């Protein structure tokens, strides 16, 4: 008698899905690709990349760059082509406040005493991936 494998129960599917590991891994990978695209875009413009995924306590800054005398704190967002919501629209007031808080702490701890650095600004970067895999990058300086 040949036995077939039992069908996955709704419970086991829910348990696997609720862990979110595959979805979370995919989001992290997409986020890393978006940050790669932003860093490449900035480097091509002669902007110095100071740090990626900079931790400030429990807060994180996606990209820290030096644009002449300015330290740019950059929040990176991504969406697929054809998304109904623009990537930049996903930076809500709460996220802006967290990024500002992280940037201000980083400024006090690191950049306030660096020669040649005059100020800090908060930029937003939107990365859209086309079906071909090509990325388009839009950076809004002093976005918030």
UniProtKB/Swiss-Prot annotation:
Q: Which PANTHER family match?
A: UPF0102 PROTEIN YRAN
**Name listed for the protein in its UniProt record:** UPF0102 protein sce2912
Similarity comment: Belongs to the UPF0102 family.
Which Pfam family name is an example for this entry?
A: UPF0102
The organism's superkingdom is given as: Bacteria
Where is the organism placed in the taxonomic lineage, from the top? Bacteria, Pseudomonadati, Myxococcota, Polyangia, Polyangiales
Q: Which GO terms describe its molecular function?
A: nucleic acid binding
- Organism, by scientific name, is Sorangium cellulosum (strain So ce56)
């Amino acid at each position: 008698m040949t036995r077939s494998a039992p069908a996955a129960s709704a419970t086991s599917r829910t348990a696997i899905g609720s862990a979110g590991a595959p979805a979370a891994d995919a989001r992290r990978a997409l986020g890393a690709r978006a940050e790669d695209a932003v860093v490449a875009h900035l480097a091509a413009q002669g902007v110095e990349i100071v740090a990626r995924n900079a931790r400030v306590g429990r807060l994180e800054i996606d990209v820290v760059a030096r644009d002449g005398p300015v330290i740019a704190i950059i929040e990176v967002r991504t969406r697929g082509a054809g998304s109904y919501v623009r990537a930049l629209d996903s930076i809500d007031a709460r996220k802006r406040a967290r990024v500002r808080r992280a940037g201000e702490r980083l400024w006090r701890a690191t950049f306030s005493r660096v020669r040649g650095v005059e100020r800090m600004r908060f930029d937003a970067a939107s990365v859209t991936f086309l079906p071909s895999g090509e990325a388009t990058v839009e950076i809004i300086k002093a976005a918030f």
